[in-house]
């Protein structure tokens, strides 16, 4: 009986499957939550300042140091864009560790999906934590169009990047903006990008 009790008390220590998508942290739709904060905080500013970071997988100590450092600069930075690769293998636990660290930021951030984040069912975990893989937002008169460009991880079986989404965003006239920044993890010409379509980005 004692042995059985010990086993039962240790059940929470068992990871049933590395690609179990059931999250144990409360964060959901991080981008959907933070984008309105970014837009509201910058609406009266003449100049916007943002930090681009990424590829933080397995670099938990360094990411913690980054968060501590960037929090000392919070009065001079409006928001952060994480360019993806929170994980090495797309595992739920990796996502949770990364998001737990990033949740300590005093500055709102948005997250793109990286090629490592797609592995297994990592894209599904990303969708739960951050929202859609393709999204946009406007800061002052600058539109940020954020794309999933990690074609190789889908074996080119999905339309990645989604040119339908990109076209709609670039033709959108419902809100005023004068400049556009297209943000992505895998750049045109990289091995993760579908280079059959890279000329579109020239």
Q: For the regions a protein language model found, what residue spans apply to each?
A:
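Sec-dependent bacterial lipoprotein signal peptides
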Residues: 1-11
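N-terminal active-site segment of His-dependent metallophosphoesterases
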Residues: 11-97
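Beta-strand-turn-beta hairpins that frame and shape the catalytic cleft
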Residues: 39-51, 136-146, 171, 175-179
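Stable alpha-helical elements in mature extracytoplasmic
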Residues: 46, 59-66, 83, 94, ...
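Active-site-proximal beta-strand/loop segments in catalytic clefts of secreted hydrolases
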Residues: 53-56, 83-85, 112-116, 147-150, ...
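Active-site environment of divalent metal-dependent phosphoester hydrolases
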Residues: 58-62, 88-94, 116-121, 152-155, ...
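Core catalytic region of metal-dependent phosphoesterases/phosphodiesterases
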Residues: 64-134, 138-139
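His/acidic metal-ligating clusters that form di-metal
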Residues: 71-79, 154-202
């Amino acid at each position: 009986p004692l042995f059985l009790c010990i086993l039962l008390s240790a059940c929470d220590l068992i990871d049933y499957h590395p690609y179990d998508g059931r999250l144990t942290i409360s964060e959901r739709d991080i981008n959907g939550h933070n984008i309105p904060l970014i837009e509201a905080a910058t609406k009266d500013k003449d100049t916007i300042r943002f930090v681009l970071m990424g590829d933080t997988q397995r670099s938990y100590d360094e990411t913690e140091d980054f968060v501590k450092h960037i929090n000392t600069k919070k009065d001079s930075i409006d928001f952060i864009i994480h360019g993806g690769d929170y994980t090495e293998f797309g595992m739920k636990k990796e996502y949770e560790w990364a998001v737990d660290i990033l949740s300590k930021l005093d500055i709102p951030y948005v997250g793109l999906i990286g090629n490592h984040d797609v592995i297994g069912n990592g894209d599904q975990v990303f969708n739960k934590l951050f929202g859609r893989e393709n999204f946009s937002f406007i800061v002052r008169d600058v539109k940020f169009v954020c794309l999933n460009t990690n074609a190789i991880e889908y074996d080119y079986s999905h339309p990645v990047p989604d040119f339908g989404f990109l076209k709609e965003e670039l033709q959108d006239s419902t809100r005023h903006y004068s400049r556009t920044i297209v943000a992505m993890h895998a750049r045109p010409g990289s091995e993760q990008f579908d280079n059959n379509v890279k000329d579109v980005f020239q």
